[in-house]
Amino acid sequence: MDTIVAKITNDSLTDKKIYEQAGKILREGGLVAFPTETVYGLGADALDEEASAKIYAAKGRPSDNPLIVHIADIEALYKLSCEVPDKALKLADKFWPGPLTMILKKSDIVPDSITGGLGTVAIRMPSHKVAAELIRTSGVYIAAPSANTSGKPSPTRASHVIKDLSGKIDMIIEDDTVDIGVESTIIDLSEEVPTILRPGYITKEMFEEVIGVVRIDPAITEGVKSGVVPKAPGMKYKHYAPDADLKIVEGDEAKVVEYINDNVNRLISQGYKVAVMTTEEGKHNYNKGIIVSMGHKDDELSAARHLYAVLREFDNENVDYVFSESFETDNVCLLYTSDAADDLIGV
């Protein structure tokens, strides 16, 4: 398969043709990768079972891993869900369009192929101009996981998508204006107590300011038990892992620095390629290996924006081991621990 790569130019006539071409591909059951404000998504018509099956095949993704349906207007909630609680509307009013995915009870039009056979559906309204225009132009709801080979770090640039999926999908829309760089937060509203199923840009505290008590599913850190179908992407299967062995080190700052330096020196002496993820304030503590700053210590958004691009770069550099300081904010720590890390080490 020859994959079309089309770059958004901000010329209205040229871009209109790109959206029309991509929309036609989606309506005919094809696959289109496109940018969102979080990461690049791999889209298909959500109500076309054969099209969604192509997503699983292209990514090498387990078919019991649910897909997120992307919509362009609030009315779609009532078509895709048979029960829209008040809390869902409050969250939509606060965070949509944006990096929020809500799990709701599904309506009869939603095929089991995108829900893992469950009675719930994951729904998101993206804010990125390309994603929003593609949904409107295509006239379909778009099921879209991240546009990467399953298990690889999520793509924040078109080049990442091309590397993973060129020749496997019909089209890639290029527009490298991904603002956030990490996945949407997924919250389950199908049960009595709202529950975060996947950490992301929106934090537990941000939710609780709008709808009250929210819990975090223990499966985020403990994993989903064998034989259980996950309610959301990322719960059962390890997502976004670099090829390198990634270790998060937390504890007293001096002990963390000592532990990382000792292990970096030891591994380099054994011939391994090693990297360190730190902060602007902590860079001076390390002088061996590939040293990468994730931003300032108190800026979780900077760390989040850099995360997947940095992991991709480590893959390109054939890094064997990565040591990361544990960031102060619970949200980013949770992202690292649940998505990418092989070990969380306390010192």
Language-model segment annotations:
Residues M1-S338:
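Active-site-adjacent structural elements in enzyme catalytic cores
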Residues Y336-V347:
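Single conserved hydrophobic/aromatic residue that forms the stacking wall/gate
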